[in-house]
Amino acid sequence: MAYYSIGDVAERCGINPVTLRAWQRRYGLLKPQRSEGGHRLFDEEDIQRIEEIKRWISNGVPVGKVKALLETTSQDTEDDWSRLQEEMMSILRMANPAKLRARIISLGREYPVDQLINHVYLPVRQRLVLDHNTSRIMSSMFDGALIEYAATSLFEMRRKPGKEAILMAWNVEERARLWLEAWRLSLSGWHISVLADPIESPRPELFPTQTLIVWTGMAPTRRQNELLQHWGEQGYKVIFHAP
């Protein structure tokens, strides 16, 4: 029987090794073998279980309830994403940056990035914009904490093999969201360099040998599609990022 290291499994399944360790230690979802040196060893059955765990989480099930679902056929609901959103709002109302950072770090270890961004962070950011009882300071504090964590994650991912790319916001004023998308891309094998300010035109001729990833926050306009096609015909590596 073939066995795989935690690094091999993380790359194959698209899951951060820290998340795999949390699934094992905190939630009892995985039971890998151990080498003589004490290192985790996973087999094909473990990998299948990881994929099943990912499917449950993608369906909106909180990681703490996945173990029971692996042993039964019942399914949770989206209510737990709402619970996490409410928890984040409560922390923000405390105006405690240290507690906010700590919770963002812990969530990053427990849930896949895509699910956190789509079901927790983006909904909370939207609620902060719409909630007239929430000061702009809270929204700014939340964005600052997210950018800080995303930047740290980008740095950590550079220690692993990956492809270099430059990410830029194309005519969209969403700095915090840009960093969230950089974080999302980094866990797909990219070493991302972020251009912090919005760009009116990507100017790929300035980066002739590099890969550019452009993000617009919405579907590209007709003109943007024309430019993307033109740049491709010119031999430039310009990728449109649509999360």
Curated annotation (Swiss-Prot):
Gene3D superfamilies noted in UniProt: 1.10.1660.10
Q: Which GO molecular function terms does the record list? A: DNA binding; DNA-binding transcription factor activity
The residue ranges marked as DNA-binding region are: 6-25
Keyword field: DNA-binding, Repressor, Transcription, Transcription regulation
Q: Which InterPro entries match?
A: DNA-bd_dom_put_sf, MerR-type_HTH_dom, MerR_fam, MlrA-like_C, MlrA-like_helical
According to the entry, every stretch annotated as the HTH merR-type domain falls at 3-72
- Phenotype upon gene inactivation: 3- to 20-fold derepression of several genes coding for small proteins including the ycgZ-ymgA-ariR-ymgC operon. While the BluR/F system is induced at low temperatures under blue light irradiation, it is not essential for growth under these conditions. When both lon and bluR are disrupted, levels of OmpF decrease, leading to lower drug susceptibility, with a greater effect at 26 degrees than at 37 degrees Celsius. The mechanism is not yet understood.
Up-regulation conditions: Expression is strongly activated (7-fold at 16 degrees Celsius compared to 37 degrees) at low temperature.
Against Pfam families, the record matches this protein to:
MerR_1, MlrA_C, MlrA_helical
Superkingdom is: Bacteria
Q: What's an example GO BP annotation here? A: regulation of DNA-templated transcription
Q: How does it assemble?
A: Interacts with BluF.
Question: What role is this protein assigned?
Answer: Controls the expression of several small proteins that may play a role in biofilm maturation. Binds to and represses the operator of the ycgZ-ymgA-ariR-ymgC operon and also regulates ynaK. Binding is antagonized by BluF upon blue light (470 nm) irradiation. Blue light may increase the affinity of BluF for BluR, allowing it to be released from its operator.
Report the protein name in the record. HTH-type transcriptional repressor BluR
Q: Which organism is it from?
A: Escherichia coli (strain K12)
